[in-house]
Amino acid sequence: MSGRARLGVAREALGAWLLGGLCFWALGGLCGLGATAPGAGAGGAPGTPRPCQAPQQWEGRQVLYRQSSGRNSRALLSYDGLNQRVRVLDERKALIPCKRLFEYILLYKDGVMFQIEQATKQCSKITLTEPWDPLDIPQNATFEDQYSIGGPQEQITVQEWSDRKSARSYETWIGIYTVKDCYPVQETFTKNYSVILSTRFFDIQLGIKDPSVFIPPSTCQAAQPERMSEDCSW
């Protein structure tokens, strides 16, 4: 699946975005998915659902679970597919001792990512080594199911897609998107039958309210080349 990597370089904490994007999506190795599975995606039988087109510009929130840490992390997200850039802002939901909060600005046209500590504005500038790949459903994805989330009078219909192919009976990526408007709901990555990364998206609003969020602060003019640690081990 050409380019299922969303933003693959910075730190595991962004998982679905930093390891889960552009050509890697978190160790799952979803690049080069290959031919469409029979009955799925572009090669499906008449009446088989086809991948919808996800919004190109939106803002929302995400909760990311990483198996490696056993933790959930929350962040605000600004996604600009038209200009190939993403901004992720860590959210603090509880007092966690020795936890540093960061802002990440990923500019794929420039091939760089800025990591900015929220408290001090200290900045790191890191080269992005993977090409841009949009957050959407690949055209050769396999349709798995359609169902409703919620209950009577309060439900939304979603479709579930995967990278499963006829040559194997399991998948390493599962994406859930709404039928109406094709909003991302959840993306999950597995390895050796275990979930290694799962991201939930919510509170999505179309458009970018303030495009300046993609402009690094002035402190990034003297950015260091090394990634900063999330904990207090400076």
Q: PLM features: residue spans?
A:
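Eukaryotic intrinsically disordered and solvent-exposed regulatory patches
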Residues: S73-R74, R100-L101, W161, E171-W173
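N-terminal entry/capping and adjacent linker segments that precede and initiate structured domains
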Residues: S2-R4, E12-G15, G29, Q57-E59, ...
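An acidic-aromatic
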Residues: R74-N140, F189-S198, D203
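Non-transmembrane domains of secretory- and envelope-associated proteins
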Residues: S2-W17, G21-P49, L128, P134, ...
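Short beta-strand segments that buttress and anchor functional surface loops
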Residues: G60-R66, R87-K93, T157-R168, G175, ...
